[in-house]
Amino acid sequence: MAKIKKHTPPPGWKNPLAPQQPLASARWLLGGVAATVGLAAVCVYITFCLLFWQGQWQLVFKPSRTVTATPATAGMKFDEISFDATETGILQLNGWWIPAQPNAPYATDTLLLLHDGSGSLSDSLPQLQALHTLGINVFAFDYRGFGKSLDVHPSEATTYEDADAAWRYLTDTRHLSPSRIVLDGVGLGAAIAAETARRHQQAPALILEDPLPPVLDSLHFDARTHILPIRLLFHDRFDPTETLARLRTPKLMVYSAHQAAGRYYAMAAEPKQQAIIANGQDHLNSLRSFLGKYLPGA
């Protein structure tokens, strides 16, 4: 009988029919799932942060592209002005020049109004009408992103640029003396007016009406912002505190008794005045007194 020779497999050979080791343990699978879910959560959070960073302007500004009324609606003469041309010749900003009567008390002076960052110039019409009764030329305009001005997303930086452009229009195009231009900011515009006064300290006076608290302070009341690193992401601060503490331009702060704007007044450098308005009182007398004190030759 022939002897069967035993076959020796080559080194490294494994029998495919032999029992196999499990491909993965349950712990490994759970770890992989957890890592995937964690990575997805991080990606979602980063995406949320990026979306917030891109759309944060909507928490600050409430622009309208509609101009429903003009000074003529209120019986005032005015000129519609387009100014601040780009390198390609596009006029970016649109505003209204409302002249004072030739024999008015401040016929050679101008008040540059910086509105509150909501609506359009039409929404400022009641205030423009009141300011016109002071007997001073009034120039008001819409920031980019508002009214008939260039359609872009506004930001703190662009509003400061637009205020500078309005100042240049008055001094370079209309050839007005900087010492005859009073800055008046309302709401959010108060911070813009303060920054403009810092950049153009030839202005004889600065009026801040109903100044808002810094934007970051206001955002703490918005629950959507509690899960995000707001101070890292938010670049629109509108905080005039430090500027007002150093600025030597005469200031008038007009605000309601219930507002927190009094802290601006407490920290502001002299000279300064305040008018606390309660129960719908008229603040025009305070404005008249302030203008009479600080406008040259008034």
Q: PLM features: residue spans?
A:
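Acidic catalytic loop of the alpha/beta-hydrolase fold
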Residues: 257-261
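Short, flexible loop segments at the rims of nucleotide/cofactor-binding pockets, characterized by
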Residues: 115-117, 227-234
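Membrane-embedded segments
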Residues: 88-170
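N-terminal Lys/Arg-rich, disordered targeting/topogenic segments
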Residues: 1-29
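Short beta-strand/loop motif that positions the catalytic acidic residue
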Residues: 246-248, 252-256
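C-terminal catalytic histidine-bearing segment of alpha/beta-hydrolase fold enzymes
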Residues: 262-298
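Primarily recognizes the serine-hydrolase "nucleophile elbow" in alpha/beta-hydrolase
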Residues: 169-173, 178-226, 235
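An N-terminal hydrophobic leader/cap segment in hydrolases
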Residues: 40-85
